[in-house]
């Protein structure tokens, strides 16, 4: 590290030069202002200054750290009148962190010092008492000795004075001495006993007091620590927002996340390096030697962030991606993979794991698991509906089904007294028509389905949404493929079947034959003991149409059809399309409740508020009850036909459910594609190059898109594959043209047209655009286009045969075969075969063909010629030369 002079160091730390030189001198280093100061001398000076200020340990570790933070942000909130205003948001935070280890050490050290002091005082008092006892015993002994000496002197004096009474005085004196000794001994023993008891009592009191003080100190510390822990948890869990505005709170949280994310990315520099730089980096100066980091010394603060992983609630759905699970647990995905490997399961970061496995992993890592059903939100939204009204009788929903051109729409046309059939392209129905009619005996709702083979999905939807199926069978045609399919749909849906035998006015009509054919498919007439009603009608002349209506109403009475007439409505999407002027339009058949203008409707992956409602005649209406078909406007997109339409309370929740359904549909679609890729991997590896016909399909309604797409995909073969790169409802736009150009596709429009910008883009890119109004023509032309993409088939056709009569040698060409043409025609430059005993021995081509000395292009049957075979000289007499040509055969799709 670069050494600084004394003057430069004083400028960095903000201390006068003279003052710094005095401090260096006190530390034992005499320096001038121009002298250099090394890192060791700086360390020595710092230690000296700390000792001067009373820090004996030579280090100063902060025990309390206070962090203050202030963030400013600008928030745009909505104001009155559709305007917005900017609000300055300032968030101030102050947090104090206490080093718990320091508090615990101080408390423990204080308790130990107090106990040590008490023990020292107790030992001191015991020593003083012992000294007092020894002094008393010594005084007693001295007193006893003095008394004894005095007694001896007195006795000697008395013996001298009174010789006569010596014996008597001696006896009395001995008795007195004995009594005095006994009494003194008793007093000394009593005094010693009292002193020992007093010392023991005081020692016990002091020990009890010391124990009580230690207990109180421990309780106070425990209470203080628990209170600090509680406050810390409350601070962490409390809502620290300084405003009640939702927008301000969101802005504050975003600012916090940004700051905390930036703080985590910054590297913490060692304290020694910071100290030696004198705070240059804090003031914005450029530091040197960024690549070399000094080792941390004791000057680094002792506050360390806890490395313990926070335990939290982990919400797990039915399936979850491993990386998402790791993100919810705030750990790296590699840690989750390690835990799974310990549990005996191998996984990758993008692998989808089930709910049970994810629960085991999360619990293994110490988190609390909250299991959530995937359709929990959907169930909550659909259950929050007012559907407790009383059920009342409703009109039957009748679906007209049958083979194409058997008179379904004509029958319905006669009932409605309109001319719907003439409006359909080619006289065939290509959409589901929903109508309700009033009869003398009540209302009936009719669904008219297409009979063409391509509209299988439409017929299936019609059968699912219906109460009664009317099967129209032409008396002259009998049972046809779509007739059988309609029977299967009706049986699968579990709805009763009424057979309408149409076209009985024709001469070749044979109703009995129809009954016999239908009996093979378990459709037995009532007169034969079955359950199906047969009605003979003529849609053209209107024969027995009333009888058909009576049969329908009779069947509906038997079914006892009821529905809730009031409350929030629910129904099914019969058809949908994209109208250029009105947006997404859906035909909905209301099945229960009342659909009102302004209701919030959830249709599959789409949602919206009903802006307008129209009946089948195009009239504006405000409400629709059960069994009434209506067109609704206002959805977010074009729903799929067959989706359930439900009125909900909250538009926000409806949007969430729709988005969830869209995400789920995408997951299922991707999973299906992945499965298809895995299943077809081997076949794709073994198969050769496959021609691909890319198609951009646009139609007027959703049902037609589905039907055409399904029919086109069924045309795919092993050699030519149809790929629908784009499809949708509505007119052809410039986006469709760009997509077709990028994918080298053709554009097929079914009952739709391209706008001006799309036409310009199509002409500029030379994209093939075709319009259709009848599905027959569309499918036939796509078949022809696919046939043109098939690899051609080549066939070898023999055009002539020549017999070798002689062989000549030519200096230029080698062996020349003199031949007689026995069959067909010999042409020059055609491929040939040389046959010997009817076995091919060489295959090549003609190099020279001459008649006499002239080169000719061909030689006919019965003429002689000379033939030179290219690169072959082993021609012998008797060989046959076979001339053939390769013919290309055009292939078509069967």
From Swiss-Prot:
Residue ranges of every copy of the tr-type G domain listed in the record: 393-562
SUPFAM superfamilies assigned to the protein according to its UniProt record, in alphabetical order: Initiation factor IF2/eIF5b, domain 3, P-loop containing nucleoside triphosphate hydrolases, Putative DNA-binding domain, Translation proteins
CDD domains assigned to the protein according to its UniProt record, in alphabetical order: ATP-synt_Fo_b (cd06503), IF2_eIF5B (cd01887), IF2_mtIF2_II (cd03702), mtIF2_IVc (cd03692)
Positions with a binding annotation for GTP: 402-409, 448-452, 502-505
G3: annotated segments: 448-451
Bias (Basic residues) ranges: 283-293
UniProt-recorded Gene Ontology molecular function terms: GTP binding; GTPase activity; guanosine tetraphosphate binding; translation initiation factor activity
Keyword Iron assigned: no
Protein family membership: Belongs to the TRAFAC class translation factor GTPase superfamily. Classic translation factor GTPase family. IF-2 subfamily.
Family matches, as NCBIfam families: IF-2, small_GTP
HAMAP family per record: IF_2_B
Protein name: Translation initiation factor IF-2
Species assigned in the record: Vibrio campbellii (strain ATCC BAA-1116)
């Amino acid at each position: 590290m670069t050494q600084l002079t004394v003057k430069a160091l004083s400028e960095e730390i903000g201390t006068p030069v003279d003052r710094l030189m005095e401090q260096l001198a006190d530390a034992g280093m005499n320096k001038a202002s121009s002298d250099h100061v090394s890192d060791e001398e700086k360390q020595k000076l710092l230690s000296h200054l700390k000792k001067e200020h009373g820090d004996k340990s030579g280090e100063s570790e902060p025990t309390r750290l206070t962090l203050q933070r202030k963030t400013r942000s600008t928030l745009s909130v909505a104001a009155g009148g559709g305007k917005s205003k900017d609000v300055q948001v300032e968030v101030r935070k102050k947090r104090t962190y206490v080093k718990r280890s320091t508090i615990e050490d101080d408390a423990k050290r204080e308790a130990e010092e107090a106990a040590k002091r008490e023990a020292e005082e107790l030992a001191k008092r015991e020593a003083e008492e012992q000294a007092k006892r020894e002094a008393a015993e010594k005084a007693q002994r001295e007193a006893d000795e003095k008394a004894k000496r005095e007694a001896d002197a007195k006795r000697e004096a008395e013996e001298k004075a009174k010789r006569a009474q010596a014996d008597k005085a001696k006896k009395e004196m001995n008795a007195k001495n004995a009594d005095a000794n006994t009494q003194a001994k008793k007093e000394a023993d009593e005094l010693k006993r009292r002193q020992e008891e007093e010392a023991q009592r005081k020692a016990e009191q002091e020990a009890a007091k010391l124990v009580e003080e230690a207990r109180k100190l421990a309780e106070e510390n425990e209470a203080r620590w628990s209170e600090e822990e509680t406050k810390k948890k409350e601070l962490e869990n409390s809502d620290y927002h300084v405003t009640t505005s939702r927008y301000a709170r969101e802005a504050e949280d975003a600012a916090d996340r940004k700051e905390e994310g930036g703080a985590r990315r910054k590297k913490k520099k060692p304290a020694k390096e910071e100290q030696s730089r004198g705070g240059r980096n804090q003031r914005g100066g450029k530091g040197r030697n960024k690549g070399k980091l000094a080792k941390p010394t004791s000057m680094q603060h002792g506050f360390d962030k806890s490395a313990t992983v926070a335990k939290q609630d982990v919400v797990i759905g039915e399936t979850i991606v491993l990386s998402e699970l790791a993100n919810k647990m705030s750990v790296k995905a590699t840690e989750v993979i390690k835990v799974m490997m310990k549990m005996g399961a191998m996984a990758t970061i993008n692998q989808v794991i089930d709910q049970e496995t994810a629960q085991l992993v999360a619990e293994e890592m110490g988190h609390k698991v909250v299991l959530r059903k995937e359709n929990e939100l959907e169930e909550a939204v659909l259950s929050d509906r007012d559907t407790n009204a009383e059920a009342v009788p409703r009109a039957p929903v009748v679906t007209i089904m049958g083979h194409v051109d058997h008179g379904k729409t004509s029958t319905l046309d006669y009932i409605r007294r309109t001319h719907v059939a003439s409006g359909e392209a080619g006289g065939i129905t290509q959409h589901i028509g929903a109508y309700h009619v009033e009869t003398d005996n009540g209302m009936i709702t009719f669904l008219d389905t297409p009979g063409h083979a391509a509209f299988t999905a439409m017929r299936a939807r019609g059968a699912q949404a219906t109460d009664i199926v009317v099967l129209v069978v032409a008396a002259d045609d009998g049972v046809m493929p779509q007739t059988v399919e309609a029977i299967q749909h009706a049986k699968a849906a579990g709805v009763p079947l009424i057979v309408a035998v149409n076209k009985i006015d024709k001469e070749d009509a044979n109703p009995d034959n129809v009954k016999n054919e239908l009996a093979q498919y378990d459709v037995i007439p009532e007169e034969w003991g079955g359950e199906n009603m047969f009605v003979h009608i003529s849609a053209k002349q209107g024969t027995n149409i009333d009888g058909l209506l009576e049969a329908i109403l009779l069947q509906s009475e038997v079914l006892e059809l009821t529905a809730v007439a009031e409350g929030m409505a629910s129904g099914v999407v019969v058809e949908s399309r994209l109208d250029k002027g009105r947006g997404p339009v859906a035909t909905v058949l209301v099945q229960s409740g009342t659909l009102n203008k302004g209701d919030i409707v959830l249709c599959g992956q789409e949602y919206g508020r009903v802006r307008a409602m129209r009946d089948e005649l195009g009239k504006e209406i405000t409400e629709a009850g059960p069994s009434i078909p209506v067109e609704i406007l206002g959805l977010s997109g074009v729903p799929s036909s067959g989706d359930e339409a439900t009125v909900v309370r909250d538009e926000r929740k409806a949007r969430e459910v729709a988005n969830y359904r869209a995400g789920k549909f995408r997951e299922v679609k991707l999973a299906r594609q992945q499965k298809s890729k895995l299943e077809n991997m081997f076949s794709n590896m073994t198969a050769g190059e496959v021609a691909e016909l890319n198609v951009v399909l646009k139609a007027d309604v959703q049902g037609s898109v589905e039907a055409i797409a399904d029919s086109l995909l069924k045309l795919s073969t092993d050699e030519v594959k149809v790929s629908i790169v784009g499809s949708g409802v509505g007119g052809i736009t410039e986006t469709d043209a760009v997509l077709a150009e990028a994918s080298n596709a053709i554009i097929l429009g079914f009952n739709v047209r391209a706008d001006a910008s799309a036409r310009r883009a199509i002409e500029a890119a030379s994209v093939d655009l075709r319009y259709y109004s009848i599905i027959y023509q569309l499918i036939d032309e796509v078949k022809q286009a696919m046939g043109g993409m098939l690899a051609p088939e080549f066939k070898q056709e023999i055009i002539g045969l020549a017999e070798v009569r002689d062989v000549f040698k030519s200096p230029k060409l080698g062996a020349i075969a003199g031949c007689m043409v026995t069959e067909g025609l010999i042409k020059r430059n055609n491929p040939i075969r040389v046959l010997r005993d009817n076995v091919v021995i060489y295959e090549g081509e003609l190099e020279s063909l001459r008649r006499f000395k002239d080169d000719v292009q061909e030689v006919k049957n019965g003429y002689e010629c000379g033939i030179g075979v290219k690169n072959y000289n082993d021609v012998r007499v008797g060989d046959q030369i076979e001339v053939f040509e390769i013919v290309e055969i055009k292939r078509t799709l069967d």
